[in-house]
């Protein structure tokens, strides 16, 4: 049996399964979520997205447009091959009507599957600009790394930065953050005096800190995953650079609300740009944070609102379609939708199916003994700048 024959049979099975799912007069709408719930590096994101999605269902019930909503969760451990297999199984065996998407490598892996099956897929975690180009059935409610990095470049110019060193990990998110920041910063007249790339795994910051000292920029734009930002800031202070006048800036997942208090006081004063802070001052967000913490015993972060808003998009689209779940009808209902989220006002770009949202400038401050990302500036209705430039 040839690979081509197997692919043809699989494609036929996917299309048949999806058509059957959409056409049936079922009383249940199944949302199949493939997230990393275990595995190194990505399980925290899966935990946050699921908690956000479940909280939305707690707030709004599990029935919409006369249909019961069932959230089916599968753990792909952040592995692309796992995600592709699990999504295929959910389409064919579980007969899901909608897919909820996770981190970038996994959603890119099953893009062709949901395209063949014509299933609306709400991306709740991935932040790569390229994500929504992988399938015409992808729509995003998470975040876009280039949005915050681009805005950070604009804010830096407006606030006196002229000579900047960029320091990022050698991986796709790091290079995307660097690219977006550099494009905006340089087109507004700033100078990048050096772009430094460092290993992703267990980096030794010492030589890079010395290089920053030697270059003597007024600002360092950095981007590292997880708790590495805290390690960097600690070593930055220990080597006397904190008093050198060099400012540290970066995209907001550097100071992730879920990890911030574990990073320590060396994060105080760090300025970032992001779409969400748990300290966002709105009635809706205060209720969201209180209810989230009661349900989960940890603080919500920017990934959690991707899950919460993802379920909102699904619910509101089903209301508009009267419960119809075929992908084309749902996508048409989702495009252009606008609503108030715990993060603020947001909408779905009708052309790119990407998120349009406010980007906040945040400073780490200590309030009542806890570290928080406190908003002090805002850029309204930001699109994905890397798509807008094309």
Segments from the language model and where they lie:
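Periplasmic-binding protein-like
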Residues: 90, 94-103, 122-124, 165-168, ...
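Solvent-exposed, acidic/polar segments of extracytosolic/periplasmic ligand-binding ectodomains
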Residues: 29, 335-390
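Bacterial N-terminal signal peptides that target proteins for export
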Residues: 1-9, 19
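Extracellular/periplasmic Venus flytrap/periplasmic-binding protein
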Residues: 85, 128-130, 136-239, 276-287
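Beta-alpha junction/loop-to-helix N-cap segments that form part of ligand/metal-binding clefts
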Residues: 28, 44-48, 59, 63-132, ...
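Extracytoplasmic "Venus flytrap"
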Residues: 29-56, 74-80, 103, 167-175, ...
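C-terminal segment of classical bacterial N-terminal signal peptides
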Residues: 15-24
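Extracellular/periplasmic periplasmic-binding protein-like sensory domains
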Residues: 233-308, 319-321, 325, 365-368, ...
């Amino acid at each position: 049996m040839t690979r081509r024959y197997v692919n043809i049979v699989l494609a036929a099975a996917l299309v048949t399964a999806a058509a059957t799912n959409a056409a049936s007069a079922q009383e249940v709408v199944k949302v199949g979520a493939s997230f990393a719930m275990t595995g190194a590096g990505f399980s925290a994101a899966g935990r946050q997205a699921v908690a956000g999605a479940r909280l939305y269902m707690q707030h709004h019930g599990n029935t919409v447009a006369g249909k019961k909503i069932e959230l089916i969760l599968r753990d792909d451990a952040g592995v692309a091959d796992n995600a592709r297999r699990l999504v295929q199984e959910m389409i064919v065996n579980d007969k899901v009507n909608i897919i909820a998407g996770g981190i970038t490598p996994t959603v890119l892996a099953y893009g062709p599957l949901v395209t063949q099956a014509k299933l609306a897929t709400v991306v709740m975690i991935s932040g790569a600009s390229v994500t929504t180009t992988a399938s015409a059935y992808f729509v995003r409610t998470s975040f876009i790394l280039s949005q915050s990095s681009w805005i950070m470049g604009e804010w830096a110019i407006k606030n006196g930065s002229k000579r900047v060193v960029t320091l990022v990990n050698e991986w796709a998110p790091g290079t995307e953050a660097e690219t977006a920041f550099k494009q905006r910063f340089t087109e507004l007249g700033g100078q990048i005096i050096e772009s430094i790339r460092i290993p992703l795994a267990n980096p030794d910051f010492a030589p890079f800190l010395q290089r920053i000292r030697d270059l003597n920029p007024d600002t360092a734009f950095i981007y590292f995953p997880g708790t590495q930002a805290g390690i960097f800031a600690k070593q930055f202070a220990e080597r006397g650079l904190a008093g050198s006048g060099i400012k540290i800036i970066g995209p907001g997942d550097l100071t992730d609300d879920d990890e911030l208090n574990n990073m320590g006081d060396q994060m105080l004063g760090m300025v970032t740009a992001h779409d969400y802070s748990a300290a966002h001052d709105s009635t809706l967000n205060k209720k969201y944070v209180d209810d989230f913490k009661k349900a989960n015993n940890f603080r919500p972060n920017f990934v959690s609102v991707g899950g919460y808003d993802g379920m909102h998009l699904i619910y509101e689209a089903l209301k508009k379609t009267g419960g119809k779940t075929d992908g084309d009808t749902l996508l048409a209902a989702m495009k252009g939708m606008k609503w108030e989220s715990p993060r603020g006002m947001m909408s779905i770009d009708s052309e790119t199916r990407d998120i349009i949202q406010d980007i906040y400038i945040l400073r780490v401050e200590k309030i009542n003994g806890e570290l928080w990302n406190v908003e002090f500036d805002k850029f309204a209705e930001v699109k994905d700048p890397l798509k807008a430039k094309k």
